[in-house]
Design a protein with these regions (language model features):
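C-terminus-biased signal that marks the final domain/tail of proteins
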Residues: 1-185
């Protein structure tokens, strides 16, 4: 495995099953795993937001903030690893299939994080919708304060650049509060 793949596969397995016996330096990882509990929608969201929490490793993009410079391509550090939720994630999807939702209505819910899921709430999308909130429809490849994507992207950039200002977890707490509300609606 490439180092960036290894760190994401290993941390994903450990995120969903902390008691898994896999080790970071295992030669390979099994494709399928089981856990002793049913995985939830929140587990899937946390997986895609994973930044190596609960491990001895730090996200690679933290190196510069720690005064160690920007990582050089092809060089690896024993502590800094490439996380699942990294600066290259532009959006994330979770497909939640539900027995009570007919196929004609999409069969379930697509949860979409418009922007990095690290600091963007997952929005529920349904297969039979005909329209969406106007801010979701704003197009363009430059910042636009009427665009949900660009607003969330700006928040993500600020949280990444100034982690000390946001270390209380208020943004994550508010995102999870909104998501939990939408899950029951």
């Amino acid at each position: 495995l490439q180092e960036a793949d290894r760190s994401r596969v290993w941390s994903g397995i450990k995120s969903l099953d902390p008691s898994s016996p896999v080790k970071y330096d295992d030669a390979s990882f099994d494709l399928l795993h089981t856990t002793d509990r049913k995985l939830t929608l929140r587990d899937a969201m946390n997986l895609q937001r994973n930044r190596l929490e609960g491990t001895k490793y730090k996200p690679q993009d933290q190196m510069e903030l720690d005064g160690k410079g920007i990582p050089k391509k092809g060089e690896f550090d024993a502590v800094y690893k490439y996380p699942i939720s990294n600066p290259n994630v532009m959006e994330a999807h979770i497909f939640q299939l539900k027995d009570e939702v007919p196929a004609s209505a999409g069969g379930g819910t697509m949860w979409l994080s418009m922007g990095s899921p690290r600091n963007a709430p997952y929005l529920p999308y349904y297969g039979n919708i005909l329209n969406t909130y106007q801010a979701y429809q704003e197009l363009g490849d430059h910042y636009n304060d009427r665009s949900w994507y660009w607003t969330i992207s700006r928040i993500n950039d600020l949280v990444a650049k100034y982690p000390d200002l946001f270390e209380d977890g208020a943004i994550r707490t508010e995102m999870e509060r909104l998501e939990s509300q939408w899950m029951v609606e």
